[in-house]
Amino acid sequence: MPNRIFIDTLFVIALINRRDQYHQQALDLAEQFEGDPLLVTDAVLLEIGNALARSYKQEAVEIIEQFLAAEEVEVVHLTPRLFAQGLTLYKSHQDKAWGLVDCISFIVMREAGVNQALTFDQHFVQAGFQALMREFPRT
């Protein structure tokens, strides 16, 4: 069984937005990892909904519902403990421009033993993870 891969907001935005500079790369990676076990947090799902609300709301609803229904996608729910851990990480890295949702993602990835993320976000690399969209060439 392949290792789980974390889904980040920036990947989903690139996947949905045809004008995004990473759109084709996101499509290619989605095809490459189709059926593989995936991991996402409901905080990321909230971020997806917010980011796509203006221009791609229907597409956001569809992909969020697909993630929630898919057997290969594990959705980690935000608990008070997880929020507190994420906030602690967020506060302790004043030298980084990491967002709170990213910090929560990093905690979840570490606890789940996940090293790869579908993202091009440099913050994941700074935190010691592989940002797959940075490693696979754009087409």
Predicted regions and their residues:
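Short, well-structured N-terminal submotif of metal-dependent ribonuclease cores
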Residues: 1-40, 53-64, 136-139
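Acidic, PIN/NYN-like endoribonuclease modules and their adjacent C-terminal/linker elements
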Residues: 2, 106, 112-139
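A generic structural signal for short hydrophobic patches within well-formed alpha-helices
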Residues: 12, 45, 124-125
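Non-catalytic, surface-exposed connector residues within folded enzymatic/regulatory domains
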Residues: 23-24, 42, 61, 77-80, ...
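Short secondary-structure boundary segments
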Residues: 42-43, 102, 121-122
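Short acidic, glycine/proline-enriched helix-loop-strand junctions
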Residues: 67-70, 74-79, 87, 93-95, ...
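Active-site neighborhoods of divalent-metal-dependent phosphate/nucleic-acid chemistry enzymes
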Residues: 75-116
